[in-house]
Amino acid sequence: MKLLRGLLITVLVLLGLLAVAVAWLRTQAPGLEAYRAHRYEAAPRPGALTATWYGVSALLLRDGEHAILIDPFFTRPEGLLPLVLNRAIEPDEPRIAAALLAARIDKLDAVLVSHSHYDHAMDAGVVAKLTGAMLLGSASTANIGRGAGLPDGRIRRVEPGEPITVGRFRIRFIASRHAGASGGRPTGDITAPLRTPAHYLDYKLGGTYSILVEHPQGSVLHHGSAGWEPGALAGLHADLVFLGVALVDDLPAYLRETVDLVGARRVVPVHWDDFTLPLDQPLRPFPLVVRLDRFFAGMAQRPEIQVQTLELGREATLFPASVPSGAPASAGGAEMR
């Protein structure tokens, strides 16, 4: 009994120290000033390919006719303790609907998911249902969609490397790896429709992908998690990389296997914010997991690569020089094949 009591006290003390450390890191937010100093702004123009970032690796790409949303995550269940205790969570549909309304998103052609952890995939089925979109991702992502009530006719399980055409977007999912020594726990697959509420750890990894999006105005690579499959991106090209920067342990190697392999000279860091905080609070780097200061220090050693950051929820034209003058903006569906 004494031993058990001692272990319990030790655990409580360690949790208390962790809470203090997390609170301190949240106040310090190392690297946040550098992030703000690299802000990229280019006002949206008719016909332009634009990007809007919504925290973590959630990214909206649209060109006035068609729109795709990658890794939507608006619910953001609050607090670290529920995450540690693996409590039950579920998509907050009213919050999702409000976020879509604020973002002027009433219709999407496709929702893409890079892997099936909750911070990338939990909201995906609901977003697809609310916007009339197809859901594209792994078999695990498909089961998240089914759990949200999305019919199979609106779900497409992707095969690595296959080209998928959505309007003027050409999309390819490339097999990758999750960041971190654990390989991305919880690993494994979601093998049946995931009904919610479900626990954090029910959102198993499934496949992990880089997503290449090609468009007549330019090409972007969405690399949401800071792992990589050696050589997987060889022979591909992207002008710009949206690069996940959580759990980076070897930045030079990471850049070689992502940014350098695709020949990009522009990088936008994503997946750095504390997603246990709601989007209506100021963003902070995720404590103990993200060191923006180290990322920017490392990028200073690669001056040929331009680091640009996006303001939360603010739309920006990605390739201003490629925008046709006076191009009309219109709404339309997608041809997917």
Report the location of each language-model feature.
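N-terminal Sec-pathway targeting helices
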Residues: 1-19
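Membrane-interface motif at the C-terminal end of an N-terminal transmembrane signal
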Residues: 14-34
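Conserved beta-strand hairpin/beta-sheet module of binuclear metal-dependent hydrolase folds
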Residues: 44-99, 202-225
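Pre-active-site segment of Zn-dependent metallo-hydrolases
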Residues: 66-112, 117, 122-126, 187-196, ...
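Active-site neighborhood of phospho(di)ester-bond hydrolases with catalytic His/Asp-centered motifs
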Residues: 70-71, 107-116, 136-138, 221-224, ...
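Binuclear metal-ion centers of metallo-dependent hydrolases, dominated by the metallo-beta-lactamase
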Residues: 134, 146-163, 256, 260-337
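Active-site-proximal loop/helix segments of hydrolase catalytic cores
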Residues: 193-261
